[in-house]
């Protein structure tokens, strides 16, 4: 829902993209349904199903208030990096766009991976969370994002969604969540149209 401009940008340029989903989203007991929905959404965005991985770890269950262990996240992410020779990670920032604690936990897991020195040749970038005005300004936020990225001295990148219709179609694959307010979110959210990535130092 948040990363579709980045995914579209990378797949259209033939990057070897892998998606690691650290939970099946079983907070409402619909984990298996949501797993299949994400597979279909990734197919719309041209990510091969064999390059999408889900975890259903007992200590990484989805839900507000269910804080994830950062050391465990670091170990799991580190194993994926090693197993697939990954040299570039894109994740949430420390607010996680929506403020969801699990989004924030993933950021801290990646941050810890970078700081422990075990992965020296890896680069990581975070999806920048914006204030509520920018978040719901739709395509107008492209201009703000471009300005911030230009003034960042190379620490930020602005990725435009060149295929917004695919983002709508991909989100529509999540039929269990495709309710009226999420349709409005996809239409008005700046994250449908542009992603601003910031390098994690």
Predicted segments — roles?
Residues 116-201:
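The feature marks non-catalytic terminal segments
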Residues 1-121, 173, 180, 185:
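Active-site beta-strand->loop->alpha-helix modules in alpha/beta enzyme cores, enriched
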């Amino acid at each position: 829902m948040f990363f579709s401009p980045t995914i579209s940008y990378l797949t259209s340029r033939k990057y070897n993209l892998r998606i690691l989903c650290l939970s099946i989203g079983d907070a409402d007991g619909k984990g298996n349904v949501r797993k299949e929905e994400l597979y279909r959404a990734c197919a719309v965005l041209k990510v091969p199903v064999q390059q999408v991985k889900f975890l259903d770890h007992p200590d990484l269950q989805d839900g507000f208030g269910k804080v994830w262990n950062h050391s465990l996240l670091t170990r799991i992410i580190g194993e994926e990096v090693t197993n697939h020779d990954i040299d570039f990670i894109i994740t949430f920032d420390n607010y996680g766009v929506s403020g969801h604690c699990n989004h924030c936990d993933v950021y801290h897991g990646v941050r810890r991976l970078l700081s422990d020195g075990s992965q020296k040749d890896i680069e990581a970038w975070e999806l920048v969370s914006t204030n509520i005005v920018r978040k719901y300004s739709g395509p107008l936020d492209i201009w703000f994002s471009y300005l911030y990225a230009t003034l960042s001295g190379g620490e930020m990148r602005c990725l435009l969604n060149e295929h917004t219709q695919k983002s709508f179609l991909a989100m529509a694959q999540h039929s269990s969540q495709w309710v009226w307010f999420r349709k409005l979110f996809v239409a008005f959210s700046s994250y449908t149209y542009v992603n601003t990535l910031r390098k994690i130092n």
